[in-house]
Amino acid sequence: MDEITYDRVQEESNPKVKQLYWDIAFGLQDVDGLKPSQYMKDLSEEHISGKKTYVQVQNEITSYYSKNKDNHEDNDEEEADEVATAIYEILSDKSFRFDFLTLKNYHKRLFINLDKEKYNPGNFRNYNFTKDEPVLKGDTVQYQSYDLIEETLKYDFNEEKDIDYSKFSEEELIDRITEFTSRIWQVHPFQEGNTRTTAVFIQKYLISMGFNINNELFKDNALYFRNALVRANYTNYSVGAKETKKYLNMFFENLLLNKNNDLNKDDLKI
């Protein structure tokens, strides 16, 4: 009997796919108001055209910031460049396992080359925090307590594993994906980078289930996605605000069902 062999996964060669992955990687930095450097953009163009491999781009961007630590003052550009490079790698990687450990691994890969004290890559936070949200007029979402992070994620992931999306209507599908995404984001397990980590994980999860998704939404609407998550987890009756998943549903309808909902960031303000 002929032995069935494994095929080693090769680096993505399609320029259009590479362009899309870089666009998403750059676009997701918008959730924190970050923009990639011109140097990073130039490297990505060389990669898309086939002049450089991904490994060469990765090594060059890491070397660039290592050599210029003392002279480089724009830490925002460094973060955008390093994280975008890692996001490209994860999106182009064909492997995936549905587990909260994968979520931790993605966070580690995104932030491993940045300030260890600030990002604590791949580790759950060990303190509680708040974050002033412009969309909430400076108020904060109530995130999960740090001592319940792992227990909560285990529960949410185990519950999600039992879901059979093949039995769902389109409306049920959107509601469930929205609910799961909202839950893991509300936990906010990491010190920094929760939205970008969540966005990458959800994209990989949906692709692993065979859904055809409009990835360009993450390229163009990253800040809307983040603010929709905020509104899905915020209630304050004193200002007439109740948590609503309407905006997140609209995002996922466009992502999964190719609808054309108007994703206007201003609509999310309370």
For the regions a language model picked out, list residue spans one by one.
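FIC/Doc superfamily catalytic core
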Residues: 1-270
